[in-house]
Swiss-Prot record:
It comes from African swine fever virus (isolate Warthog/Namibia/Wart80/1980) (ASFV). Its cofactor is Mg(2+). Accepts ubiquitin from the E1 complex and catalyzes its covalent attachment to other proteins. Performs the second step in the ubiquitination reaction that targets specifically a protein for degradation via the proteasome. By controlling the ubiquitination status of specific host proteins, the virus may target them to degradation and thereby optimize the viral replication. May be implicated in the shutoff of protein synthesis through its interactions with components of the host translation machinery. This is Ubiquitin-conjugating enzyme E2. SMART domains: UBCc (SM00212). It holds the Pfam family UQ_con. The active site is at residue 85. Induction: Expressed in the early phase of the viral replicative cycle. Interacts with host 40S ribosomal protein RPS23. Interacts with host translation initiation factor EIF4E. Interacts with host E3 ubiquitin ligase CUL4B. Interacts with host RNF138. Binds Mn2+ ion which is required for highest activity. Can also utilize Mg2+ ions. Pathway: Protein modification; protein ubiquitination. Keywords: ATP-binding, Early protein, Host cytoplasm, Host nucleus, Late protein, Nucleotide-binding, Transferase, Ubl conjugation pathway, Virion. PANTHER family: UBIQUITIN-CONJUGATING ENZYME E2 (PTHR24067). Belongs to the ubiquitin-conjugating enzyme family.
Length: 221
């Protein structure tokens, strides 16, 4: 069942490509996706192409997927091993933070929420203590260089680890479709949550139509 849901979502994303992320699927396991997230414009992460893996549990969509960065990240809410601390994907204190997982969530919404998190860290719920301390010093104007320097280092490293094809993909996507401004990611996520689409399976629909036609022919006879 889970693979049927994911196939429908995958098909939706392929038919509606985004300039903000790129997805690919493990042909042998539909529950494992590779994604590349483009750093939001007008932020320290601008220009970066950050790789991550998305793993879907057997209970999906009734349980959230797990996203883990494989690119090195410097961010208060991303663990050193790449695991992500975000309420939309984890149940811990989700209600207090105002966001809970819902089966109506779409992969688009999840990925845009992660991109939004890059520009809006929550240092009060740190996954990387050192990054959180550095970010607080930046916010308090105690150290204006350390945090930006580390982020820019990871941006450069992410590009070094990307293939020319991936870089070209985003270059073409950005030139063809205007990027979402950094302060609009949250609004975009909210709109997408309201605009849920119905998962359909063409083959099954066609089979049902054929069966109905056969029944009608038998009744006529």
């Amino acid at each position: 069942m889970v693979s049927r849901f994911l196939m429908a979502e995958y098909r939706h994303l392929i038919e509606n490509p985004s300039e903000n992320f790129k997805i690919s699927v493990n042909e042998n396991d539909m529950t494992e996706w590779d994604v590349i997230l483009r750093g939001p414009p007008d932020t320290l992460y601008e220009g970066g192409l950050f790789k991550a893996k998305v793993a879907f549990p057997p209970e999906y969509p009734y349980a959230p997927p797990r996203l883990t960065f494989t690119s090195e990240m410097w961010h208060p809410n991303i663990y050193p091993d790449g695991k992500l601390c975000i309420s939309i994907l984890h149940g811990d204190n989700a209600e207090e933070q105002g966001m809970t997982w819902s089966p109506a969530q779409k992969i688009d919404t999840i990925l845009l929420s992660v991109i939004s998190l890059l520009n809006e860290p929550n240092p009060d719920s740190p996954a990387n203590v050192d990054a959180a301390k550095s970010y607080r010093k930046l916010m308090h104007k105690e150290d204006l260089e350390s945090y930006p320097m580390e982020v820019k280092r990871t941006v450069k490293k992410s590009l070094d680890e990307c293939s020319p094809e991936d870089i070209e993909y985003f270059k073409n996507a950005v030139s063809n479709v205007p990027a979402i401004p950094s302060d609009a990611y949250e609004d975009e996520c909210e709109e997408m949550e309201d605009d849920t689409y119905i998962l359909t399976y063409d083959d099954e629909d066609e089979e049902e139509e054929d069966e109905e036609e056969e029944d009608e022919e038998m009744d006529d006879e």
